[in-house]
Regions:
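PRPP-associated nucleotide enzymes
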Residues: 1-168
Length: 168
């Protein structure tokens, strides 16, 4: 897909080296924990949600596994740069059931949420179940790195799925 969006072009340039690796997720923190990368990632993720009719306000909190905390923080900062409020919560790893899940960060009970899921290693269904057991309502799913299993989950659940097109 051809684009002239400077944020998406910058993201493509940043992710190009890691997309050629066998384990792109292991290198994702190299991008999301850099000043330039965090700014670009946060704006691209929020823009994608807006392009799919999910504006901040339609969701109040982004919820992610602990490993995606840097991306959740990037979204908070991008929202703040736009004069908008966005909170985040992280799911702590657990071996227990969804009803025993533990979150750190902003309160999620009674709030509309977007799930940030970047890996087929994350069971998006279990993440959603834990979020809903904690009282939040999931309104969409977003990934920085496109993931077919997460996309399938979102489609089967009737949720909006967003991921950037990282190919030229």
């Amino acid at each position: 897909m051809i684009t002239h969006d400077p944020q998406l072009l910058a993201l493509r340039a940043l992710t190009a080296p890691l997309l050629g690796t066998e384990e792109p997720l292991t290198h994702l923190n190299e991008i999301s924990l850099s000043a330039q990368g965090a700014a670009v990632c946060g704006h691209v993720l929020i823009d994608l949600l807006e392009e799919n009719d999910l504006a901040i306000g339609d969701y109040e909190v982004v919820i992610a596994p602990e490993g995606d905390g840097a991306l959740a923080a990037a979204m908070i900062h991008a929202a703040g740069g736009r004069g908008l409020d966005l909170d985040a919560a992280l799911l702590r790893p657990t071996q227990a059931t969804a009803s025993d899940a533990s979150f750190t960060g902003a309160p999620i009970h009674g709030r509309p949420a977007v799930l940030l899921a970047n890996s087929s290693l994350v069971d998006t269904g279990a993440l959603r179940e834990a979020v809903e057991a904690a009282g939040a309502t999931v309104v969409g799913v977003i990934s920085l790195l496109p993931d077919p299993s997460t996309q399938d989950f979102a489609r089967e659940s009737g949720l909006t799925y967003c991921a950037p097109s990282l190919a030229d």
